[in-house]
């Protein structure tokens, strides 16, 4: 009989654990987990989102209040969620998380930052009394769905990827710290060179440069070889014509001189004949 009595206690403990496990699991499911893959669900409906880190003392103190508030989510028709910034660095950049914990209220894609007391009662009053209407929403330029915040998210993800690679080089491959920095420096130079070449190629294709042709110096046009003999003949004919005209002009000048001399002689001879007759 003693052994049967001793078996009752472990069986009772086992039944208690089996009954309590689903209850505890259902309680944890009241707070939804938001990641980079499903964050766009926040754009529909009403949400309260907490950004936290496991190592943050203030975040640890907030967790019981947040879990209790999540139990009222169905009655208040609000979704209660949380984001672990250590596992989702892209979301921390997308929402510009500069302090922990940070709480956002979202209503149909409009985000407002909650800065009130962090108790269950205050959270419930904030939703039931619609106190969020008195808070100015985040500008569309800095909204999580904007191009600027998407770029910021990509930058945060890149920084986390670089950190992971750095740890892999040091811990798994055994490289020294300066060796890891050297790898990143070479990768940065190579990526910058490739990016610069790509940008130059795109700029040259979109806006080609207008190359100015040099103006030719003034020069005489050279005739083809086939026309050179004809040109020589024309030049010789022009030279002959010029010689003939010069000879004609010289002969005319000589004739004029002779005519003038004869006229002078006749005038001088005339008076002398008259004196002889007298």
From Swiss-Prot:
It catalyses: Catalyzes the rearrangement of -S-S- bonds in proteins. Residues 1-26 form the signal peptide. Residues 213-278 are annotated as: Disordered. One of its GO terms (cellular component) is extracellular region. Pfam families: Thioredoxin. The chain crosses the membrane at residues 181-203. Disulfide bonds join 56-59. Its EC number is 5.3.4.1. It comes from the Eukaryota. One of its GO terms (molecular function) is enzyme inhibitor activity. Its main location: endoplasmic reticulum. The active site is at residues 56, 59. Residues 204-278 are cytoplasmic. Residues 27-180 are extracellular. Palmitoylated; palmitoylation is required for localization to mitochondria-associated endoplasmic reticulum membrane (MAM). A lipid is attached at residues 205, 207 (S-palmitoyl cysteine). InterPro entries: Thioredoxin-like_sf (IPR036249), Thioredoxin_CS (IPR017937), Thioredoxin_domain (IPR013766), TMX_domain-containing (IPR052454). One of its GO terms (biological process) is response to endoplasmic reticulum stress. Residues 235-250 have a biased composition (Acidic residues). It is found in: Endoplasmic reticulum membrane; Mitochondrion membrane; Secreted. Keywords: Disulfide bond, Electron transport, Endoplasmic reticulum, Isomerase, Lipoprotein, Membrane, Mitochondrion, Palmitate, Phosphoprotein, Redox-active center, Secreted, Signal, Transmembrane, Transmembrane helix, Transport. Residues 27-132 form the Thioredoxin domain. Thiredoxin domain-containing protein that participates in various redox reactions through the reversible oxidation of its active center dithiol to a disulfide and catalyze dithiol-disulfide exchange reactions. Acts as a key inhibitor of the alternative triglyceride biosynthesis pathway by inhibiting the activity of TMEM68/DIESL at the endoplasmic reticulum, thereby restricting accumulation of triacylglycerol. The alternative triglyceride biosynthesis pathway mediates formation of triacylglycerol from diacylglycerol and membrane phospholipids. This is Thioredoxin-related transmembrane protein 1.
